[in-house]
Amino acid sequence: MSSPDNSSPSLRIPPWLRVKLPCSHTFADTRALVEGLGLNTVCNSAKCPNMFECFSSGTATFLILGNVCTRNCAFCNITPGHVSPPDPDEPRRVAEAAARLALRHVVVTSVTRDDLDDGGAAHFAATITRLRAALPAATVEVLIPDFRGDHAALRTVMAAAPHIVNHNVETPPAHYARIRPQADYRQSLELLRRVKAAGGVAKSGLMVGLGENDTEVEGVLADLADCGCDIVTVGQYMRPSRQHPPVERYVHPDTFESFAACGRGMGIPFVFSAPLVRSSYNAESAYNALCTLRRKPA
C-alpha cells in the first residue's frame, strides 16, 4: 500500500494535528480534583494531545504506581529513574476521584515497575476492586505493562475482573530495539492471547511515525487479529520534546482510514484509527460499541 504521507521530519505539523484548546470550567475542576487527591494522570504525564478535551468532558486516565518508570522507551514522555514504593492508599483515592467525577468508564494505567516482584499486578487488582465497589455501574479498563511475561501477574489482574485489558504493542517488531529496547513484541502478543483465553476483552494499540511503513503496520494488525484482539487503536506519534526521536512521517487521515479498514477486514471488531487517537481516547464509546455488536444476533 502506498500512502500520501509527509515523510520529512523537518516539515511543520499538518493542520489535522492542530488541537483547539477549549475554554471549560470542567477542565480546571477535573485537574484540581485529581491533583488535590495526590493522583497522577497519563494525560498530563505523557503530554497527551487530547488532555484538554478529556478533562473538559470530566474524564481522565489514572496513572498508578507513581510517575517515574523503570524503563526508558524512546517515544515516552514519562520520566525514567528511581521509583518509590507503591502507595497502599492510592487505590482508594483513585476510586474516590472516579466517584466524584461520576465516571461511567474508568481507565487505569501505570508506569512499568520492573522493580516489583509482580510488576504491580496486586496494586492494579486492588485499584480495580476499589473502583468496582465505588462505581458498580461503571466499566473499568486497565492498560497494563507486560509484567516481564509473568503469567501469574496477569492472572492476578484478571481475577479482579476488569471489563477491558489493554496492552499496547506500540510499534512493529523491527523497531523494538530502537523504540522499546526493554520490551519483547512476541511476549506482548502472548499476553494478549492469554487475556482472550481467560475470557477477557483484549485491546491493543500502536503509533505511526516512528520509522515504520504501511506494510509493517498491516503486519501488526494481522498479528493482533491472530491474537483475537477486540479493539485496536492506531494514532500518530507526536514528539514530546527534542530529546525524543523525531517524527519520521505525518500520516494522512486517509491512510488512517485505510488502516482501520484493513484491520476490520482481518477480523478485528473495532479499529479506531485517526491522527489524534490514543489508547484511552473515547474508550467508553469503544467498549459500548463492542457490547452492542456482541448483542446483535448472528
Curated annotation (Swiss-Prot):
Entry superkingdom: Bacteria
Pathways per UniProt: Protein modification; protein lipoylation via endogenous pathway; protein N(6)-(lipoyl)lysine from octanoyl-[acyl-carrier-protein]: step 2/2
Catalytic activity: [[Fe-S] cluster scaffold protein carrying a second [4Fe-4S](2+) cluster] + N(6)-octanoyl-L-lysyl-[protein] + 2 oxidized [2Fe-2S]-[ferredoxin] + 2 S-adenosyl-L-methionine + 4 H(+) = [[Fe-S] cluster scaffold protein] + N(6)-[(R)-dihydrolipoyl]-L-lysyl-[protein] + 4 Fe(3+) + 2 hydrogen sulfide + 2 5'-deoxyadenosine + 2 L-methionine + 2 reduced [2Fe-2S]-[ferredoxin]
Cofactor binding notes: Binds 2 [4Fe-4S] clusters per subunit. One cluster is coordinated with 3 cysteines and an exchangeable S-adenosyl-L-methionine.
Amino acids binding [4Fe-4S] cluster 2: C69, C73, C76
EC number: 2.8.1.8
Domain Radical SAM core: 55-269
Keywords assigned: 4Fe-4S, Cytoplasm, Iron, Iron-sulfur, Metal-binding, S-adenosyl-L-methionine, Transferase
Cofactor(s) essential for the protein: [4Fe-4S] cluster
GO cellular component terms, A-Z: cytoplasm
Pfam assignment, any one: Radical_SAM
Cellular compartments annotated: Cytoplasm
PROSITE patterns per the UniProt record, alphabetical: RADICAL_SAM (PS51918)
Homology family: Belongs to the radical SAM superfamily. Lipoyl synthase family.
HAMAP family noted in UniProt: Lipoyl_synth
Protein name according to UniProt: Lipoyl synthase
Species assigned in the record: Nitratidesulfovibrio vulgaris (strain DP4)
